[in-house]
Amino acid sequence: MVDPIRSPLSRAFAPVRALFVSDASAGILLILVAAAAMIVANSPLAGAYEEMFYGDLAWTPIAKLDDLHLWINDGLMAIFFFVVGLEVKRELICGQLSSPEQRTLPVLAAIAGMAVPAIVYVGVVGTDSALVRGWAIPAATDIAFAMGVLGLLGSRVPASLRLFLLTVAIVDDIGAVLVIAAFYTANLKVMWLVIALGIFGVMVGMNKFGVDRIWPYILVALVLWVAVLFSGVHATIAGVMAALTIPMRRKDGHSLLEKLEHGLAPWSAYLVVPIFGFANAGVNLSGMGLDAVLAPLPLAIAAGLVVGKQLGIFGIIVAAVKLGIAKAPANANWIEIWGVSILTGIGFTMSLFISGLAFTDSRLLIDEAKIGILGGSLISAILGYTILRLTTTHPEERPPQTVTP
C-alpha cells in the first residue's frame, strides 16, 4: 500500500535525490563553493573571511599549525589524499589499472597531460625563478569537477569515455602526489623522516600479519601524520602512505580497503573538498586591475590548463592509436575524445593545493594563481561541455562508431 504522506514527499524530493547520487553532484557543489568563496571574499564579510582562515588561533595542539587554513590544508586534506590512495591501490590491484593493456593509454595520457601543461607554463613565465616554482599547478585534473561536468551530459557520453576520464584523473593524482613529495618538500628533517618511514613499516607489518580492524590503522596513521608533518614532507603525503597499507583481503565479500573507501569517499567529496575549496578559492579583487588578471602567472596557469592539457592528452591519444600502441576508448569518435581531453583542464582542487605549496611566502602570487586556476578551469569546463553537448547524442540515436588508426 502506498503511504499517502510519504509518496508526495518522495516524488517532490526525487530530483534532489537524483542529483546527489549522480556524477554531477560533487562537481556542482564545488562550483557553488568556489562561487561562494569569491562572493564572500569581495563582500563586506571579506575581513571576517580572512580572519577566520588566516587569523592566529587562540590555542593549537601543534604550534606549526597556527591558523585554520593550515589545519585544513595540512590536516583535513590528509583525508582527501587517504581516499585517493585507497582508490589508487584498488585500481592497481583489481580495477582499471590492474593490467598493462588497461593502463597503457591512461598512463600515457596522464604523463603527457602533466608534461605539456608544465612546458606551456614555463614557456609563458620564462626565466622568472619565483614563478617557475609553480610549474606543476596546471598539471593536475580535478576528478570531482571534471566528472561533474561530464555527468551533466547524462547518457550522451559513452561509458568508455567516462571510464577513460576517471582513469586518467586517477593516474594524474598519482603523478601529483609524487610531484608534491619530490619537488615541494622544504627543510627536510632526517630524524623525523626516519621515524615516519619506521611507522609506515609498522603499518605494512600490520597488514602482513593479518590485522583487519580499522582502529589500529587509524591510531598509527595519526602518529604517521605527525611524523610526516615534522619531517618537512607535506603532511598530506601521510594519507597516501597510510592508504597503501590498508588490507585488500576480502572477508564476507568486502575488504577493509573497500569498506573504508565506500565509507569515506562521500565525506571527502561532500565535506573535506568543499571546505578546502571555500578556504582556498576566495580572492579579493579590490585593487586588482586588468594587469593583474593578465599577469604572467595567471596567464601561464590558464594556458597550461586550457591549451596544455588538451594538447598533451589528445595528442598522445592520437599518436598511440595511430602507432598501434593502444586502443582508443570504445564507441567514441575523435571529436568526443577531444572534448573529454579539454575537460581534463579542470584543475581546481589539486591545482589550488599545489599553488599554496609553490608560493608559500607570497599571498599576492597565491591570489594570482587562484585567478589563473579558476579562469582556466572555467574555460575548460565550458569549452569541453559545449563541444560534447553539440556533438554527442543519446544511445538510441547513436550509430556504432569507433576511431580508426
UniProtKB/Swiss-Prot annotation:
Keyword terms: Antiport, Cell inner membrane, Cell membrane, Ion transport, Membrane, Sodium, Sodium transport, Transmembrane, Transmembrane helix, Transport
Bilayer disposition of the protein: Multi-pass membrane protein
Subcellular locations according to the entry: Cell inner membrane
Chief subcellular location: membrane
Catalytic activity: Na(+)(in) + 2 H(+)(out) = Na(+)(out) + 2 H(+)(in)
Gene3D superfamilies to which the protein is assigned, alphabetical: Na+/H+ antiporter like domain (1.20.1530.10)
Coiled coil: none
An example Gene Ontology molecular-function term: sodium:proton antiporter activity
Record-level GO cellular component terms: plasma membrane
Annotated family: Belongs to the NhaA Na(+)/H(+) (TC 2.A.33) antiporter family.
Function of the molecule: Na(+)/H(+) antiporter that extrudes sodium in exchange for external protons.
Protein name from the UniProt record: Na(+)/H(+) antiporter NhaA 1
Native source species: Erythrobacter litoralis (strain HTCC2594)
Gene name as annotated: nhaA1
